[in-house]
Amino acid sequence: MISEAKLNEEVEGIIANAIREDVGPGDYSSLACIPDTAQGKAKLLVKEKGIIAGVAFAQKVFAYVDEALEVEVLIQDGAEVKVGDIVLYVSGSSQSILKAERLVLNGMQRMSAIATKTNAYTQLLQGTKAKILDTRKTTPGFRALEKMAVKIGGGENHRFALYDMVMLKDNHIDFAGGITKAIEKTKNYLKETGRDLKIIVEARDLGEIKEILLSEGVYRILIDNFNYEDTRKAVQLIGDTCLTESSGGINEKTIREYAECGVDFISSGALTHSVYNLDLSLKAV
């Protein structure tokens, strides 16, 4: 995962680009009917139960739009919320509140949905050693927020992008001429370029597991699209040589049994690509 400083930089970029996209040369609806001296107050209202996420993001958005806006936070990121709860109040320039409204809601609704789903998955893993991981199957331009939401929901972050970890998947292996060649070429490249990156290698069957184990320097083996029986066999083969990760269509119905196979991690793209926004609204008071 990237550093906290890099993550903050990504979030700032998301905010700047989203405001550019949404506001453009001006919010003419507000400019047309609301005086620039008008002051107002609004509440962020919960309309669906779940795990709230994006409160810190909302504060950043309000500050970016207008540093004079005052935000009173009543409920923090990661808390369980129910219908009727008020997460925060924002007060100040009415025009500024309206300018920030859509980005705040878009971000918080999406982040809260992801945090809620992640939390449900973590509950299913209780009593096992497995931890839930996200993937790169994120909304383009929104990745930092979605990965933050996974953490808020109790999950762990996989690599952020293509540059903070090496992950040799099926196509890399096939293009490189096989597992052993792909691993050796990767280790040579990292040594020659002075890059200190962990290496994950995907295995499609037990034979590939055995071949991966012949090479040193692999941080984690991705056990991809294995059934339960073969996953257990893979975990036994790997032992303490490196960490293990199950992936491939794992959902609420199957995650517990995969965890009980003894893997260290389970990665699921569904955390970020198959969620429905949590219903939130910003209402004038």
Show the residue positions of the predicted features.
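Acidic/glycine-rich phosphate/pyrophosphate-binding loops and surrounding catalytic core
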Residues: 2-215, 220, 229-237, 243, ...
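Glycine-rich beta-strand-to-loop/alpha-helix junction loops that act as flexible
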Residues: 223-224, 244-250, 268-270
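Active-site loop ensemble at the mouth of alpha/beta enzyme cores that anchors a bound cofactor
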Residues: 281-285
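Active-site glycine- and acidic-residue-rich loops that bind
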Residues: 141-143, 248-251
